[in-house]
Amino acid sequence: MTLAVILELDTIVKVIANYFNTTPSIVVEKKNQYAKNLSFEYVQITNDFVPYNIQDLLNIFYTVLDSGYDKFTFYCPNEYLDCVNDIKMISDPENSEILTTLGNYISPYNNFTYFNILYDNLGEITVEVTHLYTDEEINKISNKIDSIWKEIVKPDMTQEDIIYAFHDYIINSTRYDELYEKELAAYELELKEFYQVNGADTTKKAPKFTPTYHSNKATGPLFEKFAICSGYTDAMAIVLDKLGIKNFKVASDTHVWNVAYINNKWMHIDLTWDDPVSKDSSGKIVDTLLHKFYLIDTPTLEEFKIANHNYDKSVYIELK
């Protein structure tokens, strides 16, 4: 995901409000149909949009994302002296994992590709969200999930049976996209060279990332038959949401996978590692389906001692 450059704005409205020592009213719109309204140890849904510390800011940003808002404005109170500085810290591209982590707790349909934070030194904060999925993609994916559901789900299946069936369906119809990482590395080099030449010249358009497959999204495995870990994970998260099962995504520095709350316990599901890239002696890819990382608890996951599964336990506190 990409975090846009922060812009500083001076607004007459905020100046007038500050002069009279009042806080402008906050407009809270209706949440969209994909809002989960779930709170976790790390971050919580809030109805109070006046922040007094960093946790309050995280809760506001999380609520904005979970609600599916395209734009939201709130204000730093005079008592919160470090508010703008904390906003700068959270928004710094060097700290991009702060905002992307919030996206792991929400519906994939409400997740973002750009999260712009505009602020002025008087404390007006405006968030602008560009969502990862378009309405057209959401309709297409939802219809595809419904179609697969009719094909593989039987009336006597339990929730775990349905998860198992989708786990196998996605893996059997998908291959890990080894090309994606090479294309992304080439794009990042191209983008770096662009800014070295053009700097902050806004008349020049930066190149866009155009991978062969949309492997980082649910459209990859469901339609193009290729995925990287985020594509597998989004597809499974959408299924878990459809089942009404509490779930979120877990991210390490190099990987992402699902966890679901089953029988009063958080269980890990890693489709990527259950769909390994295997090749025969001639170098031909061999389709492989495993259940090694299907609904396993945290102690079992940790027994494998896989570096990709080294996540921040101060964030994903529920996983014990």
Label every model-predicted segment.
Residues 128-135, 262, 272:
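Secondary-structure transition/turn motif
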Residues 289-320:
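Leloir-type glycosyltransferase catalytic cores
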